[in-house]
């Protein structure tokens, strides 16, 4: 997924037509941005600051370089991108495009819909009862495709790029969980060592680079 620098990708995404926007853009260099509950906005962009989209707000693309993104329940947004920060998404949120970060975690709560890919470099990914039209990718993060989630693309754990992968000692083995009644339609490709847990009720595409460990309970075994 990360074929061009994310800062450049962020600029590209914010230049695209906004998926849900019918209001004014908000563009800052320093400072946080809040999209107020129930209101409509265009694209939201800042360099140094977090972005908060309150419940049932509608926005275009949302992007920051240094800051986290929080989207509250029932909101509708375009693409979500940050470089240094996590992305936390509430319940019943519709995301028109993808969700990406370099250094930070991504979590999508129940009833979410992501219209594109979900990707991190250094950070975990967690989905609960969420539909993803694209795929999932990470380099060093854990991934949980939680109960009832449906990923129409694949799942890929990429080999670290030598430009940003400096390790001392043995690297941590990542944990990948495909939970109860979850579906990953596309291939699961692992370019580095992982522990892959797949629930007995889950369905996946072909698996390359790892051996699935089956589990039957509500939660995967602890390592």
Annotated model-derived regions:
Residues 1-223:
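Intrinsically disordered, low-complexity terminal regions
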């Amino acid at each position: 997924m990360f074929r061009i620098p994310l800062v450049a990708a962020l600029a590209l995404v914010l230049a695209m037509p906004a998926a849900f926007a019918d209001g004014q853009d908000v563009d800052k260099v320093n400072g946080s941005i809040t999209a107020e509950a129930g209101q409509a906005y265009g694209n939201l962009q800042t360099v140094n600051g977090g972005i908060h989209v309150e419940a049932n707000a509608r926005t275009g693309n949302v992007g920051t370089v240094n800051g986290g993104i929080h989207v509250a329940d029932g909101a509708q947004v375009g693409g979500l991108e940050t470089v240094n920060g996590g992305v936390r998404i509430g319940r019943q949120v519709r995301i028109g495009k993808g969700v990406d970060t370099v250094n930070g975690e991504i979590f999508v709560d129940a009833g979410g819909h992501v219209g594109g890919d979900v990707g991190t470099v250094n950070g975990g990914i967690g989905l609960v009862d969420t539909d993803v039209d694209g795929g999932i990718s990470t380099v060093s993060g854990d991934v949980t495709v939680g109960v009832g989630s449906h990923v129409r693309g694949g799942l890929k754990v990429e080999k670290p790029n030598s430009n940003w992968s400096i390790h001392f000692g043995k690297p941590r083995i990542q944990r990948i969980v495909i939970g109860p009644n979850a579906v990953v339609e596309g291939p699961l490709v692992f370019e580095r060592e992982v522990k892959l847990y797949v629930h007995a009720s889950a369905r996946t595409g072909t698996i390359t680079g790892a051996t699935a460990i089956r589990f039957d309970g509500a939660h995967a075994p602890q390592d």
